[in-house]
Amino acid sequence: MSNERDTSRTPTPDPAEHNAFFPSPYSLSQYTSAKTDFDGADYPTPYKGGKKVLMIGTDERYILMQNASMFSTGNHPVEMLLPMYHLDKAGFEFDVATLSGNPVKLEMWAMPGEDEAVKSIYAKYLPKLKAPRKLADLLEQAVADDSPYAAVFVPGGHGVLAGIPHSREVKRLLNAFLAKDRYIITLCHGPACLLAPAVEEKPEDYPFKGYEICVFPDALDTGANLEIGYMPGPLPWLVGENLQKLGVKILNKGITGQVHRDRKLLTGDSPLASNNLGKLAAKTLLEAFAR
């Protein structure tokens, strides 16, 4: 019989799906908290123009792991909501889209229940999270020369691996944003979206080759995340490894809250970077679009 410590590191069964699991109680005690490091969002001269930010969320909760288990995941709420809070306070409204138009899936076990900033922005955008636009339906508008979007934001959480990196719509959107000098904001596992422009293309033509980014370290997904029961098995593929194969340079080795800007690409290393990335994104967009 397992002792309590061993049991606490065992992933928790998710009864909604066959052989599916939430993170273990022990891993959640290490990785989640009731409050974030949010320390204010002071933007005395917010943007008052018409440009918005398009947030692409994941509409799939389950990732099939190498051992045939299912990881019950989604978007990480802090990674989504803290950057949204900063940008919203800076005057940039959000539209929300998923690949299918089905609701955004959130890792509610990571929601910081005592964090008023996160809770308030969640309440504000909950209707859009529950009834997002289908990305294909707004794609023509989004990539147009007169696009209403100043930036696209792809938050993290392992659920991002379930379609976004292989999406032709995401490929077209990111290619258009690069070509038209718009901003791309992403963190943790969200940079998996940067793989989309490589779909059905030659590696030597990859548009993010040579870019420097922050991203969640593969070493944690192959090490600690398995050892403490955060995931029920090895991921089907690794984000950093695949980006590096295409010529992307990863700056961080651990997770410290590091953020980085390379041209119009803004990235962060983990949930710990959520507040920092929100500040960087708000400052960057305000400087770019100040009137």
Swiss-Prot record:
Record bears the keyword DNA repair: yes
Positions in coiled-coil regions: none
SUPFAM superfamilies: Class I glutamine amidotransferase-like
EC number(s) from the headed UniProt entry: 3.1.2.-, 3.5.1.-, 3.5.1.124
Gene Ontology, cellular component aspect: cytoplasm
Keywords (A to Z) from UniProt: Cytoplasm, DNA damage, DNA repair, Hydrolase, Stress response
Subcellular locations according to the entry: Cytoplasm
Reactions the enzyme catalyzes: N(omega)-(1-hydroxy-2-oxopropyl)-L-arginyl-[protein] + H2O = lactate + L-arginyl-[protein] + H(+); N(6)-(1-hydroxy-2-oxopropyl)-L-lysyl-[protein] + H2O = lactate + L-lysyl-[protein] + H(+); S-(1-hydroxy-2-oxopropyl)-L-cysteinyl-[protein] + H2O = lactate + L-cysteinyl-[protein] + H(+); N(omega)-(1-hydroxy-2-oxoethyl)-L-arginyl-[protein] + H2O = L-arginyl-[protein] + glycolate + H(+)
Classification via Pfam families: DJ-1_PfpI
Catalytic residues in the record: 188 (nucleophile)
Keyword tRNA-binding: no
Class in the EC hierarchy, top level: hydrolase
Signal peptide interval: none
NCBIfam families listed in its UniProt record: PRK04155.1
Family: Belongs to the peptidase C56 family. HchA subfamily.
HAMAP family for this protein: Deglycase_HchA
PANTHER family: PROTEIN/NUCLEIC ACID DEGLYCASE DJ-1-RELATED, PROTEIN_NUCLEIC ACID DEGLYCASE 1
Protein name: Protein/nucleic acid deglycase HchA
